[in-house]
Amino acid sequence: MAGVSAVRWLGLRSRLGQPLTGRRAGLCKQARSCRFYSGSATLSKVEGTDITGIEEVVIPKKKTWDKVAVLQALASTVNRDTTSVPYVFQDDPYLIPASSLESRLFLLAKKSGENVAKFIINSYPKYFQKDIAEPHIPCLMPEYFEPQIKDISEAALKERIELRKVKASVDMFDQLLQAGTTVSLETTNSLLDLLCYFGDQEPSTDYHFQQTEQSEALEVENDETSRRKAGHQFGVTWQAKNNAERIFSLMPEKNAHSYCTMIRGMVKHRAYEQALNLYTELLNNRLHADVYTFNALTEATVCVINGKFEEKWSKIQELLRHMVAQKVKPNLQTFNTILKCLRRFHVFARSPALRILREMKAIGIEPSLATYHHIIHVFDQPGDPLKRSSFIIYDIMNELMGKRFSPKDPDDDKFFQSAMSICSSLRDLELAYQVHGLLNTGDNWKFIGPDHHRNFYYSKFFDLICLMEQIDVTLKWYEDLIPSVYFPHSQTLIHLLQALDVANRLEMIPKIWKDSKEYGHTFRSDLREEILKLMARDKHPPELQVAFADCAADIKSAYESQHIRQTAQDWPATSLYCIAILFLRAGRTQEAWNMLELFRKHNKIPRSELLNELMDSAKVSNSPSQAIEVVELASAFSLPICEGLTQRVMSDFAINQEQKEALGNLTALTSDSDTDSSSDSDSDTSEGK
């Protein structure tokens, strides 16, 4: 027991960090990096003997946690609320969007508010000097966009380059040359980087919230030019003899960086031929290009040559051989650029695309989602029903299942849209579930892309579920995805209605109509007509007929609320017929009879089925006046059923002499109109002969 006490005391003192003396201190020094344990509950050996079971303590390496690790841990403890809209919209309950259009307006307004706040902070920086954020958040503090160095020096030029002042940087460079000051090669290359990236034009206002008088004058000067362009970044073209070319020609010494910057700038702004010519000059000067320049040259090669596929593919292979000769190792973007270029040639590019994919794996480059996105487009055309699928999507999914991806290429967020589009074309629900499972693996959901990409993906996914899945599973997906993930399009709701029709679950129609109103589809005529047709097609139990009639009355109110847009075509005959039939079947007779006025008002011809049901309703209520009104409506449109309705009135109702005369006049008018129409047709036939 004394030995046990000694060992426990030593362990306690060593854990508490208390100093030891004498024999105990010596033992502790030897055992400071060791941990004692015994194979049994009691220690059989006394102090001073060998202690069995000594295990070396391995101190773990320091782990660097992400700044939002705590938030990520907390977020992992909760699930998505399927009854609410996406979290980005959960601000003011009165501002929560209810449709795709409103959600886009919400996001634009939110981004505009952020830009305005940033503009105010940068316009009045003296009022925002106190940093209250812990840790420091740079975007909450003012940014200084105006140069602080006023004299003419290379330091001033560097400052203007860092501030992305294109015109000011060029002016400072020219002033330095006029003063006889030699600008270093590094600074000149930085200036070329700025000019080539922005195409020798001032950046858009997204980069500068403060506009000085000089920049405003420059904006007015370039206004006419900018209007001819489709957009700032995508519309800028490379101008001949611009400042970049002028400064490049003035450089007394050029290195590989100078040439590579110019080549990439020319390709970025669609000066492909100039880029290829400059690459030839680079080779003549015995310089080597970097991998990013070769990536740009690959794009330029495909865009500039107006030849056949074999010629363009030969040029791409020649560039790859140049990379080998210059000992430039390709990266992921190299292969993705080649695959993106091969998409132009479809069937001809299938074999080269597979060779490129095998080469990637052979040199140890892991393909990204963008790689498989380009492969899909080489073998298939998502969304094109005329193209026969090559089924390569199955091989891709077998390779990707269970993997977690990180962003490596700007086109990574396009893979899931392409894959789900192929699933929709193939009508393969199991494959769609695999794609959706891959999306929900780890953080792959971040690659769903912007709002319109997400809507496209989930629309295709849910449409396929409506077409192929059982109705209970379909409704479960409906509750899970809408509106917590995306807002459905009216066509998506029509597909859901068709699924309900196939499964004989029409009792869900009133709920679908209620949801469609919340999602902003109240005035979608195709959706309203589909709902009315399904409700009016067959007879149902009384409780369901009452619910259908309420839904029909709500749809009727939606038609009537279209003040300016309401025209004759806004009230199709089918909708009028369905609403009247639903009112009759639910016992709302007066509302059904009121629908007859709408037929006359909008000049719509009622169906014979509706007239017969109206006649049955008049017979049940024993109302000869209503029966005669039905005959009058049929006579007004010269319907063939008018004579049969007249006979029903004569046989089924007790009418007076005045009503008999009215019926006789209606019958005579109908027969006269029939005679006139037949004579007109006979005369037309004789004239034709």
From Swiss-Prot:
PPR repeats: 149-183, 184-219, 255-289, 290-330, 331-367, 368-404, 412-446, 454-488, 489-523, 572-606
Protein's UniProt name: Small ribosomal subunit protein mS39
Residue segments, region Disordered: 665-689
Biased composition (Acidic residues): 673-689
This protein's record includes keyword Flavoprotein: no
Taxon lineage: Eukaryota, Metazoa, Chordata, Craniata, Vertebrata
Gene Ontology CC: mitochondrion; ribonucleoprotein complex; ribosome
Subcellular location, record wording: Mitochondrion
Family, similarity comment: Belongs to the mitochondrion-specific ribosomal protein mS39 family.
UniProt key word Cytoplasm: no
Gene field: PTCD3
Pfam families xrefs: PPR_3, Rib_mS39_PPR
Subunit structure: Component of the mitochondrial ribosome small subunit (28S) which comprises a 12S rRNA and about 30 distinct proteins. Associated with the 12S mitochondrial rRNA (12S mt-rRNA).
Annotated PROSITE patterns: PPR
Transit peptide residues according to the UniProt entry: 1-37
Residue(s) carrying N6-acetyllysine: K126
PANTHER family named among the record's database cross-references: PENTATRICOPEPTIDE REPEAT DOMAIN-CONTAINING PROTEIN 3, SMALL RIBOSOMAL SUBUNIT PROTEIN MS39
Keywords from the named record: Acetylation, Mitochondrion, Repeat, Ribonucleoprotein, Ribosomal protein, RNA-binding, rRNA-binding, Transit peptide, Translation regulation
GO-annotated biological processes: mitochondrial translation; regulation of translation
GO molecular function, one term: ribosomal small subunit binding
Described purpose of this protein according to its UniProt entry: Mitochondrial RNA-binding protein that has a role in mitochondrial translation.
